[in-house]
Amino acid sequence: MSIVVADVDKPAAVEVAGQLADEGVLVADARALPVRVDVASADEVAALGEATMDAFGAVHLVCNNAGVSAGGLSWEVPMSDWQWVMEVNLWGVVYGVRTFVPLIVRSGGGHIVNTASMAGLTSPPFMSPYSVAKHGVVALSEALYHELSFSHPEVGASVLCPGWVRTRIH
C-alpha cells in the first residue's frame, strides 16, 4: 500500500516517509509521498486530496490524526487558542471527511479513521478547548459511521480515542 504522509512540518513528513521505506513497511512498488499540509485550511486539505489522486489514482484509507492543545481555565484561555485548537482538531477532521470520503467512494471503498481522544469521552479540567474539539470529532465520527452504512456501505468510519500518549502535541 502506498502512503501519503501529510504534516504541517514538511521535514517531519519527509523523515517519516523515509522511515517507512527504511523499515520495510513499503512492499513491492509501494511508496510514501511526504506532503506539507495545514489541516486547518480547507483549501490545503482539498489540495491534498487532489495530490493523492494525482499520485496514486485512488484513496482507500484515511487517518485524520492532527492535533494541538491549549489549556487553562476555560474563561481565561485566549480566544486565539480556542480558535487554533478548534480549527486543527475539529475543522481539520471536517475538512478531511468532506475531501476524502467522496474520493474513497469514487475509489470503490475503504475506511476513514478520525483520531479523537479519551478527552472526547470525558471532560478533564483545564483542557476545555481540546476536550470540546475532541467531543466534536467523536460525534462527527459516530454520525458518519451511520450515514455511510446507509449510503455507502463499502466505506467504513471509525473513531480512535487514545489515552495519554507522549507526542509532539502542544
Task: Describe every region a protein language model picked out.
Residues M1-E15:
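Conserved glycine-rich Rossmann-like NAD(P)H-binding loop of the short-chain dehydrogenase/reductase
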Residues K10-V14, R36-A47, M79:
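The beta1-alpha1 cofactor-binding region of Rossmann-like NAD(H)/NADP(H)-dependent oxidoreductases
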Residues L20-D43:
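Rossmann-fold cofactor-recognition segment
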